[in-house]
A protein has these predicted regions:
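Long, well-ordered alpha-helical scaffolding segments within enzyme catalytic domains
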Residues: 25-37, 92-110, 147-174
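Solvent-exposed beta-strand motifs enriched in subsets of small alpha/beta binding domains
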Residues: 6-8, 173-216
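Active-site-adjacent mobile loop/cap segments within catalytic or ligand-binding domains
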Residues: 4-6, 59-63, 68-73, 77-80, ...
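Catalytic-core regions of hydrolytic enzymes
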Residues: 1-95
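Catalytic cores of processing enzymes, dominated by hydrolases/peptidases
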Residues: 89-141, 182, 186, 197
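Hydrophobic anchor at the start of a short beta-strand
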Residues: 40-43, 66-68, 111-113, 134, ...
Length: 216
């Protein structure tokens, strides 16, 4: 199991704002914690980009079994609260969607519908066209002082909850019945190229030597 985390908005788009924060900054902070706690089981998509505006998913090249989660925060009146998961409305929620929805609505209660199917959003459609499993998670309302306080104080709980929804453990813990050797996990990122051809050349060289390589 491997997670591919997209932090919503960015690249000059702050997203929703409220209580002294921007959506883009907060979900990037959460993405960072998911990456830190998830170790080699997590890839954080380039946070300098706006993956909606630049149509990033359509040019994405990752293994088809990677699970994509796009992180957002809701915006409405100051009294609106709650977290939920959005999926492509043409499909049924899977076990991961339901586990995420149960987790996030437990931390951010208030929504009557915790899994919502939408057919009008670009990224769910782009992911489906590429054959990638995808869901968008709204982590409470940035316009709610209560939700923002919970988000900030329980960020690691949210990050761990996301990992656990996919059967993954945070680094340094294990829910598996198998005995594994404890130790640090080191990740290596090789190269950044302006030319896609050069990136593809290096990826091919790494794959020929038996290494897993992806271009993001």
């Amino acid at each position: 199991m491997h997670l591919f985390i997209i932090a919503g908005h960015g690249a000059g788009d702050p997203g929703a704002t409220g209580n002294g924060y921007t959506e883009a900054e907060r979900v990037r902070a959460l993405a960072s914690r998911i990456g830190a706690l998830g170790g080699s089981n997590v890839t954080i998509a380039d946070t300098s980009r706006n993956w909606y505006a630049d149509n990033g998913i359509s040019s994405l090249n990752i293994p088809k079994d990677y699970q994509i989660i796009e992180l957002h925060m809701d915006s409405a009146s100051a009294s609106a609260r709650g977290g939920h998961v959005i999926i492509n409305g043409k499909y049924k929620a899977d076990q991961y969607d339901n586990a995420l929805a149960k987790m996030i609505s437990g931390i951010f209660p208030g929504r009557s519908q915790i899994v919502v199917g939408r057919t009008d959003l670009a990224n769910p459609k782009r992911a489906a066209a590429k054959g990638y499993p995808y869901r968008l998670m709204e982590c409470g309302f940035i316009t709610s002082a209560t939700d923002v306080k919970i988000f900030n104080s329980r960020m690691d709980d949210i990050a761990r909850g996301i990992l656990q929804a996919f059967g993954l453990s945070a680094v340094g813990t294990s829910t598996s019945t198998k005995t594994e050797t404890a130790g640090k996990i080191y990740r290596v990122q090789v190269g950044a190229f302006k030319s896609k051809a050069n990136a593809e050349k290096l990826a091919s060289e790494l794959k020929s030597k038996g290494y897993q390589a992806i271009i993001i």
